[in-house]
Regions:
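A residue-level signal for conserved active-site and pocket-lining positions in enzyme catalytic cores
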Residues: 31, 78, 93, 164
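N-terminal anchoring/stem segment of glycosyltransferases
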Residues: 1-62, 69, 73, 82-83, ...
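Hydrophobic/aromatic beta-strand patches that form the interior of the parallel beta-sheet core
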Residues: 9, 39, 88-90, 114-115, ...
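Short, flexible, basic/aromatic active-site loop/helix in glycosyltransferases
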Residues: 135-155
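Conserved donor-nucleotide/metal-binding helix-loop-beta segment in metal-dependent transferases, i.e.
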Residues: 98-134
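Short glycine- and hydrophobic/aromatic-rich loop-to-beta-strand nucleating segment
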Residues: 157, 162-166
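Conserved small/polar residues in nucleotide/adenosyl-binding loops
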Residues: 172-173
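A conserved donor-nucleotide-binding helix/loop in the catalytic core
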Residues: 51-90, 96-105, 112-115, 159
């Protein structure tokens, strides 16, 4: 895609660790290098609090962010859909190397959505076990003949939502 408007959206609400600050800075530098708008949401807007009785989440997992889960704040990126041709939603703990190519240039023009199927990544054995357990916990009850999550020896197929790329010209809103 030529002459497109692009944005990387990140969520960094609540107390920030040195890791998050370092990673967000790497994304900012990457955006400057590739002429990409960079937006970091630093104050929650949705304030979605999980139900600890139904979610199985520990209280500590969301109280450290003020009583809600920042993952839901990623949805605020959708507010920018009319303004950009492409948007990437990037977790605040992802570091982008200085020599990384422009991810938008690697996104196929005929793909509306890009993400990583986590089990297909080159991963260590200890992490394979983590993915198998996680996917079984999340998708085991949902899997049926009506909805196929394509299970294999590494668990169910799911995308790691830490990096999402959207080609908005192919998404009808």
């Amino acid at each position: 895609m030529k002459n497109t408007s692009r944005m990387i959206f990140q969520v960094a609400v609540g107390p920030q660790s040195n890791l998050y600050a370092h990673c967000i800075e790497s994304v900012s530098n990457y955006c400057d290098k590739h002429d990409i708008t960079h937006h970091v949401l630093t104050a929650p807007q949705l304030w979605i609090k999980p139900d600890p009785f139904n979610s199985g989440r520990s209280e500590e997992s969301y109280m450290k962010y003020g009583g809600y889960l920042p993952i839901y704040e990623k949805e605020n990126a959708f507010n920018y859909l009319p303004e950009f041709d492409q948007i990437a939603i990037v977790d605040a703990d992802i570091y982008i190397r200085e020599d990384a190519p422009n991810i938008f240039d690697d996104m196929s023009d005929d793909a509306a959505f890009g993400a990583v199927v986590e089990r297909d990544m080159p991963i260590e054995d200890w992490y394979k076990n983590k993915i198998i357990n996680y996917s079984q916990m999340q998708y085991g009850q949902l899997h049926s003949n009506a909805s196929d999550f394509r299970p294999n020896e590494l668990g169910f197929e799911f995308c790691n939502m830490g990096l999402i790329v959207l080609n908005l010209s192919l998404i009808h809103i």
